[in-house]
Design a protein with these regions (language model features):
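Amphipathic alpha-helical scaffolding segments comprising HEAT/armadillo-like alpha-solenoid repeats
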Residues: 567-573, 597-609, 632-648, 671-683
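A glycine-rich helix N-cap at a beta->alpha junction
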Residues: 78-102, 110, 117-119
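N-terminal catalytic cores of NTP/NDP-binding nucleotidyl/phosphoryl-transfer enzymes
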Residues: 6-16, 20-83, 199-230
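Substrate/cofactor-recognition hotspot
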Residues: 311-319, 323-568
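Alpha-solenoid helical repeat scaffolds
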Residues: 586, 590, 603, 607, ...
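Active-site cores that bind ATP or allylic diphosphates and position pyrophosphate for catalysis
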Residues: 68-70, 76, 98, 112-274, ...
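Alpha-helix N-cap/helix-start positions at coil->helix boundaries
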Residues: 578-582, 614-619, 655-656, 685-690
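Structural signature of alpha-helical solenoid repeat scaffolds
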Residues: 592-593, 623-630, 663-666
């Protein structure tokens, strides 16, 4: 811990209260219980850091327990991946346990519960049970098999265990209270028949316990003191305690369940089902695709374990759900890599630069600092020659006033090298620049101390010597989704929000010091961002993944789009006031083009809703967005908001608002008929020929 004492989170306070009440510290025990049906993702990292962090804080053991109670979805591949991820994150577990280790004990307890009249075999169909269970506002009713005799229940349960029945014919249910306000207490399932091969127990078992029965009992077997879950299990706590009541021995530690808010990240999907869909549909290239929020995907992209741990510590532990900006995760990564990643030069979109007054055949090895944030990182030598590669975007023949890069007649400094001035260009038959000719100031070598070296110029460019450059494949990764909440829109498939430019592969050049890089080595490509050597890289073909940019491009883009929308409303005010028809049309054209350029679905929807008010200009803006944005259609807007928009717009004093509302209604067949009365009234009262038309 740091010298500055941090305040306790509410889970830590609960533990402190337990200790203060006399609970022995040597009895503290925690666990991390993943189901091996997928890869761990960044959401799991919060729970991992919490549980293992508690273990470190209180010097208490933390078990890794695999909740392997559903052989239909679980595989050894996932077990191995989870263990690898935990170790990579820097955590070691006390014992490796499996719920399947306890199958016999769980079965024996179930038999005892049957004998005690606390469980019974139900032979209804799942649909019949669902009806019989009632609703949140209506109590359930007893099923026809609830009062089976103990003897019949034991015989049927034994038959289920022996594989005498098909899947779905019988289940074991706890006998609790069919009128409970908590629907989970209305005789929940304990066991079901599954004729599936289990990755550890093979075909030994034909019945498998349900999560709610296995989880708390496993905690009890392992003597877990504090069972920490996410908030969706709040309603399960009553059932957790009821099951423990059936087996609890007062001489042992009784586990208690506590809940905290899970991690929700914007621009991210963390449902295992949806992540699996991305993999199976080949939207991504496997679970460790660098665009995935899985721990293995983040690791491959170049995230460090330290940055993820720092991120989890920064967001803290809370009782209320909230959405964390993924930019914070990137910030934690930049903060770590800035201190540790060596600086190197790479050119991703090269154009040749020839220094015409530099002697042919000459080369110099210039000194370059590896990391100005770390004095111990030292220096390296970088070759400089007559022919160099620079980024194509770093040159313009004729540059605007605030272009701080290279242009004809202007000077820039080459990083660690000389000041150059662009003199001319060579173009191909299509007019594309193939070469830039420049001259250099022989006395301007960086760090030489000469007057020329101290001269201020427009900017500093990175470069690579042509004769020494090493080819490399560079994979430019970006966010997988373009919307803040891709799986939160009822009328939309989360795949509708895929970022079509989430991966761009380019072939560039890197400096020769990178010839012997190893997988997972991390670098800052100066002026470009942080990059990591991919697992597919080899000595014959270097492959780098873009890990994160030097700045948050999405934040800049988001602000730009928000500012664009604000400015559009100002332009609409001009449009409405303009008397000249041609000038008005010319004002409207860029407004429509700007509407089409907005990618953020949530921003578009929110802007429409925000402008549904008794203001003609605002209504005009909302209707323009609905008509011209290719990101939304009418049914994407909540019906109450949409109805209000149409109703207010048809009554607007501005003919242009009424016209747009009618056009939008024509494209909205589901709602068009609902406004026939208002449209008929317009026909009778409207004086504007355009509206009537």
């Amino acid at each position: 811990m740091s010298t500055e004492e941090k305040s306790l989170n509410f889970i830590e306070q609960i533990i402190e209260d337990s200790l203060a009440s006399g609970f022995p510290q040597d009895k503290l025990r925690f666990r991390f219980p993943p189901e091996p049906n997928g890869y761990l993702h960044i959401g799991h990292a919060k729970s991992i850091c919490l549980n293992f962090g508690l273990g470190l804080r209180y010097n208490a053991p933390v078990n890794l327990r695999f909740d392997d109670t559903n052989p239909a979805k679980e595989e050894q591949e996932y077990v191995d991946a989870i263990k690898e991820d935990l170790q990579w994150l820097g955590f070691n577990w006390a014992e490796e346990r499996y719920a399947s280790d306890y199958f016999q004990q769980l079965y024996d307890w179930a038999v005892v519960m049957i004998k005690n009249g606390k469980a019974y075999i139900d032979s209804q169909s799942s649909s019949a049970m669902a009806i019989q269970k009632g609703t949140p506002t209506q109590p359930g009713v007893d099923g026809p098999f609830r009062n089976r005799s103990v003897a019949e229940n034991l015989t049927l349960f034994e038959g289920m265990k022996n594989g005498d029945f098909e899947e779905g014919t019988h289940v074991l249910r706890a006998k609790i209270d069919m009128s409970s306000k908590n629907m989970l207490m209305r005789d929940p399932l304990m066991y079901r028949v599954l004729h599936r091969h289990h990755h550890r127990t093979g075909n030994d078992w034909k019945i498998y316990p349900m999560y709610d029965f296995a989880h708390g009992q496993s905690d009890y077997i392992e003597q877990i003191s504090h069972s920490i879950c996410t908030l969706e299990f709040v309603m399960h706590r009553e059932l957790y305690n009821w099951f423990l009541d059936q087996i609890y021995d007062t001489t042992k530690v009784r586990p208690n369940q506590y809940e905290f808010a899970r991690l929700n990240l914007n621009y991210t999907v963390m449902s295992k089902r949806k992540l699996l869909q991305l993999v199976q549909d080949k939207v991504v290239n496997g679970w460790d695709d660098p665009r995935m929020p899985t721990i293995s995907g983040l690791r491959r992209r170049g995230y460090t374990a330290k940055s993820i741990r720092n991120f989890c510590e920064t967001i803290g532990v809370a009782k209320r759900e909230n959405v964390i900006d993924v930019s914070l995760l990137d910030f934690c990564l930049r903060e770590d890599l800035n201190k540790t990643a060596p600086r190197v030069m790479a050119v991703l979109d090269p154009v040749k630069l020839v220094i015409t007054n530099y002697p042919e055949g000459k080369e110099e090895w210039l000194e370059a600092e590896n990391n100005q944030e770390d004095e111990s990182a030292g220096f390296r030598k970088v070759p400089f020659s007559r022919e160099l590669y620079i980024e194509r975007e770093d040159f313009l023949e004729v540059a605007p006033a605030k272009f701080f890069r290279l242009s004809i007649g202007n000077e820039v400094r080459l990083k660690n090298g000389y000041i150059i001035k662009a003199e001319s260009v060579t173009k191909d038959l299509e007019g594309n620049i193939t070469q830039i000719e420049a001259s250099y100031d022989t006395d301007s070598l960086s760090g030489s101390g000469t007057e020329a070296s101290k001269r201020k110029v427009a900017g500093t460019l990175h470069w690579v010597s042509v004769s020494h450059a090493i080819e490399a494949e560079v994979r430019l990764y970006d966010r997988l989704f373009i919307d803040e909440a891709p799986d939160a829109h009822k009328e939309k498939n989360f795949l509708d929000f895929m970022n079509k430019t989430s991966l761009e592969i380019v072939n560039g050049f890197v400096e020769p010091s990178l010839i012997n890089v190893k997988v997972n080595d991390k670098f800052q490509f100066q002026r470009l961002g942080y990059f990591t050597v991919d697992k597919e890289s080899s000595t014959s073909k270097l492959v780098f993944n873009k890990t994160v940019g030097l700045k948050d491009a999405w934040e800049e883009k988001g602000k730009k789009e928000e500012n664009l929308l604000m400015n559009m409303l100002k332009e609409i005010n001009k449009y409405v006031k303009e008397k000249d028809e041609n000038t008005a049309k010319n004002t409207l054209i860029p407004i429509i083009e700007n509407i089409k350029s907005i990618d953020n679905y949530s921003l578009v929807i929110n802007t429409i809703v925000k402008n549904i008010k008794n203001d003609n200009n605002a209504l005009l803006f909302a209707n323009l967005i609905l008509k011209h944005s290719d990101k939304v259609i009418a049914k994407d807007i909540e019906i109450d908001h949409l109805t209000k928009l149409y109703s207010m717009s048809l009554k607007s004093q501005l003919a242009s608002v009424r016209i747009l509302a009618i056009n939008n209604l024509k494209n909205d067949s589901e709602n068009f008929s609902n406004f026939q009365t208002q449209l008929a009234e317009l026909k009778n009262s409207e004086k504007n020929s355009n509206v009537l038309e």
